[in-house]
Design a protein with these regions (language model features):
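RNA-contacting regions in translation and RNA-metabolism proteins
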Residues: 1-176
Length: 176
């Protein structure tokens, strides 16, 4: 099993390095031992045949001026991750949970979302009024939901459709 994961990791690393080379971006691809805990590796498997989702293949791309790989609100990073998953899945004939990060961007972004969630939860608690956050992608909404899941005074729910979907933070007293 360990040698199989090593082989899959090398395939993924090779694909990512080749894509970066084709984009003429000089960067180092560093394998990370385990995926960030709030990353969702079990997204819908494009090939329908999921590998063991407990063994996430994770990389941090390091170098100078890599903002272009992150893009606006991490959209380019999400797209690059998706493309790598598709290519590797095609080569390995199985969907593999692959997580990419650029210079720790996701970690910083997740910490920022968690801080926002707690700040807004305290505001909702004090004002006893629901508060709708700005629309955000599913993986960002998930972080907010997980951050506030055990909050004693508020609960969360998603509302809206498509790109307008957002998290609403609601005082728990409204549910009593």
């Amino acid at each position: 099993m360990a040698t199989e994961k090593r082989k899959e990791t090398e395939i993924a690393r090779s694909v990512l390095e080749k894509l970066l080379d084709l984009m003429e971006i000089k960067a180092n691809v560093v394998p990370v031992e385990e995926a960030p805990p709030d990353e969702s590796p079990d997204e819908e498997a494009p090939l329908g045949n999921a590998a063991d989702t407990t063994s996430v293949i994770s990389f941090d791309v390091q170098g100078d001026d890599l903002g272009i790989l992150i893009g606006r609100r991490g959209q380019t990073l999400a797209s690059l991750q998706y493309i790598v998953r598709l290519i590797v899945g095609h080569q390995a004939q199985v969907w593999l949970p692959i997580v990419l990060d650029i210079e720790g961007y996701k970690k910083r972004h997740n910490e920022s979302l968690q801080a926002l969630a707690w700040r807004m939860a305290e505001q909702v608690k004090a004002q006893r009024m629901p508060f709708a956050l700005e629309p955000m992608p599913a993986f960002d909404r998930r972080i907010v939901h997980l951050t506030l899941a055990n909050h004693p005074d508020v609960t969360t729910q998603s509302s809206g459709e498509g790109e307008s979907r957002r998290v609403v933070i609601i005082p728990k007293e409204q549910f009593r």
